[in-house]
Amino acid sequence: MRKLCWLALPCSAAIFLGVCLLPEGLPLPLGLCCGLGGLLSPAFSGKTRWKVLLTAMGLALGFLWTSLYGTLFRSPALAYIGEEPIEYTFEICQFPVSTSRGVSFSARLLTEEGRGPMVKIYAGDETGDLLPGDIVRCAVRLASSAQVRGEEADYYTSRGIYLLGYAQDGVTLVGRPRAVSLRFWPQYAARALQDSILRVFPGDVAGFFTALITGEKGALPAGAYRDLQRSGIAHVVAVSGLHISFLAGLTVLLLGKRSRLGTFLAIGLMVFFAAVTGNSPSALRAAFMTSLLLLAPLVGREPDKPTALSAVLLLLLLPQPYAAASVSLQLSFGAVAGIFLVSEKLSERWLRALPRWDKPLGRIFRRCLVFALCSLSVTLGALLFTTPLAAFHFRSVSLAGPMVNLLTLWAISGGFIGGLTAALAGLAFPVLGRALAWVAACPARWVLWVAHGVSRLPFSAMTLLSGYLVLWFVVAYGILILWLIGRKRIRPAIPAAALVFTLCAALVTYAWPIRSGTLTVTALDVGQGASTLLFSGGRAVLVDCGGNSGDDPGDLAADYLQSLGTSRLDALVLTHYHTDHAGGVPQLLARLEVPHLLLPDVTPEDPLRREILALAEANGCEVNFLSDDSRFSFGNVELTVFAPLGDGGANEEGLSLLCRAGEFQALITGDMNSIVERRLIKHKHLPDIDLLLVGHHGSKSSTSEELLLAVTPEQAVISSGYNSYGHPAPEALERLGAAGCDIYLTRDMGHVTFIYKGE
C-alpha cells in the first residue's frame, strides 16, 4: 500500500503548489518536466527505482491536472464576468441563507448547452420561499469570487464556486420539480435536524447544538464562535473525526466488527452524514479515512495511516483541485497528520511512567489520568501542524487550547451523542426529544461557559500583531525541532521552560513600549469604520467601535487590548450611532469589562442606540449622555469631549474629542462635515495638535482647509477600508498634503499606533 502513498502524496503536493503558490501558467511546464524526469527512474535500482518513478508520476499528474482543470472548468466560468446585469436561468442548489441585505444561495447556471458553472447569488428579501431544485430566472451582474470587498479571497473558489452573482430586480420562480431529487436529500435531512433542534433544545444552547451536529456555525449565539476560537476549541463545530467515528462505532457495535453488512452500513451512514453537514473537507476526510480503516480487515490488509491519509487527500483534490486552498481542508489534514506523527508515541511514553494502584479508588483515579493523558497527547498532536496554519490564516494562536480541550472534551463528546439522539427523537416524539435535550444541554452549557470565561482572559490567545510575537513563533518551532533531534539527551522540562521564557519575553517586549508610554493612540484597522484606542498608565478609553472588516470590530478591539494584558476598558465613547462607528459594541461588551459609556443624547428612536442601551444595562455599564462639554482624566491624559454642534443628521450631531498628554495633543472629529468643523473652530478653543484622526474616513466633505489651518496637525491617520464611497477622497488627501501632514491609512498599514513617551 505504500506505493499508493508514494504516488498520492507527490500528486497532492503538486496540486497544492499549483493552486496556492505558483503563477497560473507554471504548472503545465512543470508537469511536463516532472513527466520527463520519470524517465530517469531506470538509472536507479531496487526500491529506489519505483519510488523515483511514482514520485515523478505523482508530481506530473498533479501539475498537469491542475492546469487542465483550470482550462476546462475555471476559465469558462470566468468568461461570464461582466459589468452589466444579464438575465440567466439557474437551478437552486441550497436553501437560501439570510444576510444583512436579503438572502444568498448557491445555484447552477443553466445554458442551452447544459449545466454551467456554480454561482453564489446575493438577492433581496423579495425572493420568496425558494427550495433546492427550483428553477429561477433573474438578472445578475456576475463577478469573480476571488475578489471579496476588494481583497483576494479563496473561500468560494476552494468550494468550486468561481462566480458571485448580484441580483438586480428580484428572482422569478420558473419551475419546481414534483419530487425532491436524490441530490438534495441530505439538505432536506439537515433542515429537518435543524428544525428539530430548535424545537426541543433550550434557546441558550440550540445554536450550539445546530453547529455541533450539522456544522452550521452561523447558528451559534453572537460571539460564541470567537469564544471557541480564542479558547482553542473552535474545531468542535467543524464536523470531523469526533462525529464520524461515533456514528461508525455505534453501527459496528450493533452489527459486529467483522460484519460486512455492518461495515457497508457504517460507510453509507458516514457518507450521508458528511453530505448532511455540507460535505466540508473535514467531514469528508473523516468519512473516507474511517471507511478505509473499516474496509482493510475485510480485504485482508493492515491499515496503513500514511497511505490512508495521502489517498484520501488525493481523493478530495482530484475532483476539485482548488479545494487545496480551503482552510478547513488544511487544518483537518494537518491535525490528523500531527496525531499520527506524535500522539501515540507521547501517550505510550506517559502511560509507561504512570504508576498502578490496586485499590478501587486508585484504579478509578488511574483511568481518569489515562483519559486525561491520552486526550492531551491527541490535542498536542493536532496542534503540531494546525498551530502554524492558524497563525498564517488567522494571525492568532490560542495559548489556552490544550487546557480547555482537557476541560471540555468529555462534555463535547457527551453533548454530541446526547444532542444527536435528542434531535433524532424530536423528529417523531417531541416530548421525548425535549427530555433528552434537557440532559444534553448541561455539557453544552459547560463548554460555552468555559470558552466564554477563558476568552475574556488576557493572553488566552496571542494575536500576532508584532514582529516579536512572530519571531517567538518561529523560535518556538525551532526549539521543538532541536528537542526532537536530541530528545534522548534532553529532558522535556528544558524545552518547555525555554518556550515559556521566550513567550514571556516576546509578550513583554511587544507590550512594554505601549504600556510604558505617556500616551498611546492606536487607530484600529476595522475596515470601513472607526475605532481608536487611547492607552495611558494602564488605563484605556476606546472611541467608537464599528467597521466592515471580516472580523467583528468589537473582537478586534478586545483582542488588541487583551494583547496588552488587560480585559478592562475604562470607558467607551461613541461619537454617533452609525454601525461603522458603533456596530461592534455588542461583542465588545461581551468580551471586556466596560464600566462607563459616553454617548451623544440624540436620535432617541435609533434602533442601534436602543440596542446599545439595553446591552449597557444588562452588563452593568454606567451610561452618561453628553449634552454639554465634558472633561475627565485617565492615566496621564486629559480628555475633553465636545457636545454635538450640528443638527440634521447623526454625522452632524456627533461628539468630538480633544486628547492632551503633556505636549502631545490629538483631535478626533468623528464623521463631522466641514460646516460643523467651522462651528468647532469658532466656539471651542482648539490648540495646535500633533495628530488628527481624519473625519468621516477621509470624505471630501470633511477635513476642511479651515480646520487644518486652525489646528495645524503634523500627522493624520485615516481609518477606512473597502467601500463604494470613494474614501479617502483625493480632495481630502490633497488638503492634508498641502497642510504638510504625514498621512497614514489603516487600509494599507493595518493598526496604526502612535506612542508619546513624554518629556
Question: For the regions a protein language model found, what residue spans apply to each?
Answer:
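Metallo-beta-lactamase
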Residues: 569-580, 602-603, 692-696
